[in-house]
Amino acid sequence: MTSYMAIDGSALVPLRQKPRRKTQGFLTMSRRRISCKDLGHADCQGWLYKKKEKGSFLSNKWKKFWVILKGSSLYWYSNQMAEKADGFVNLPDFTVERASECKKKHAFKISHPQIKTFYFAAENVQEMNVWLNKLGSAVIHQESTTKDEECYSESEQEDPEIAAETPPPPHASQTQSLTAQQASSSSPSLSGTSYSFSSLENTVKTPSSFPSSLSKERQSLPDTVNSLSAAEDEGQPITFAVQVHSPVPSEAGIHKALENSFVTSESGFLNSLSSDDTSSLSSNHDHLTVPDKPAGSKIMDKEETKVSEDDEMEKLYKSLEQASLSPLGDRRPSTKKELRKSFVKRCKNPSINEKLHKIRTLNSTLKCKEHDLAMINQLLDDPKLTARKYREWKVMNTLLIQDIYQQQRASPAPDDTDDTPQELKKSPSSPSVENSI
């Protein structure tokens, strides 16, 4: 049961209340905690591919799910016997249309401009059209959800159990009351203001999460109640700052309200304090902590830096691959595929392309001639060369013999003015060479 405190007989302020911990619009528990059997008769069901949010570089970006449409709710399960849904979408808050930006065929999306976009894909065009019609009718005919009802839920972020907040330890309130009594006995002129400043300091020192700040403020309120009675007995004026929060305030509204309460209470304190007290109070303000950056923004920054690092590593690997270098910087031997690619590469200048092509053909011709010459030298250097071996070699290298004969016929006849003997000038014909061997 919640107790209330009346201040100046005008407003009722709750002293202790269980905070509402909201995660993606949960009211009591997640609607994904329902099995396929418990859903009963479905309006439409079947296997669909769902695009992953954080797909790795080489893994598959689409995963197959058993999807069930029940009224205005869309559930997807890992299999037909699953006890809990992997995801849930409340369709009246979303729009359904084809996803032309996806490379996968038969894809459609369920999107919301301010919440999220889900991508699904069917096996064929017929299934995609059936799902689009069913989802479109569910979006149009059903009424929009209330603000307290969840819009979507997924299994990537586990649902926290909604448990009652544990009360603060008793020794904390005792120590705060003891310090308050010591301060009232030592400096009676600052009794009321010290208590209000302690509650204000607890209000300003708010961490990034909202429920913890609520608990701190509620812990300080009972201490201020105890201080009110002591201050009234002494007849001192009391300055008390009360901040009433809405059930679900925005983060900007929290900071704005804190700043306003801090400014108003500070002006009241400075008017009632002397110069020495104001100097000490300003020194205390210097030590006030500033709320940290929200946890969500930190996670987004980490993800962005990670993506940029992955992109840099990918670029570095591709540049090493293009330069035929190993990750350690060593020269990597070229493969046949890379050599073939390098041969196909062409320059924009046609004259240079012709010259390069001619050089490549001459190099290949030179290699062939060197190979033929090595075969002929191997035959002539054989000390055990016989007619039978020559005939076998001739049958095996018929093309080489024909090439030699053609070159001899195409070569110009030697002049008579040479000093070579007459019998050497006449080249022997092929039949005579064969007969002599």
Curated annotation (Swiss-Prot):
Primary location recorded for the protein, binned into one broad class: cytoplasm
Assembly: Interacts with guanine-nucleotide exchange factors PSCD1, PSCD2, PSCD3 and PSCD4. Interacts (via C-terminus) with cytohesin-2 CYTH2.
Write out the ranges of the annotated region (CRAC domain). 315-320, 339-348
Query: Which residue stretches belong to region Disordered?
Result: 143-225, 273-307, 406-437
Show the InterPro entries listed in the entry. Answer: CNKSR, PH-like_dom_sf, PH_domain
Where does this protein reside within or beyond the cell?
A: Cytoplasm; Cell membrane
What positions does the domain PH occupy?
41-140
Instruction: Specify the protein name.
Output: Interactor protein for cytohesin exchange factors 1
Has the keyword Lipid metabolism been applied to this entry?
no
Keyword tags:
Cell membrane, Cytoplasm, Membrane, Phosphoprotein
**Required for interaction with CYTH2: annotated segments:** 389-437
Q: Where is the composition biased (Acidic residues)?
A: 151-162
- Annotated Gene Ontology MF terms? oxygen carrier activity; peroxidase activity
Point to the regions of Polar residues compositional bias.
201-214, 427-437
The upper taxonomy is: Eukaryota, Metazoa, Chordata, Craniata, Vertebrata
Gene3D superfamilies linked:
Pleckstrin-homology domain (PH domain)/Phosphotyrosine-binding domain (PTB) (2.30.29.30)
Key word GTP-binding present = no
- Tell me, in a sentence or two, what this protein's role is: Enhances the promotion of guanine-nucleotide exchange by PSCD2 on ARF6 in a concentration-dependent manner.
Kindly list the positions at which Phosphoserine occurs in this protein: 411
Where do Low complexity bias regions lie? Answer: 172-200, 273-283
According to the lineage, what is the superkingdom? Eukaryota
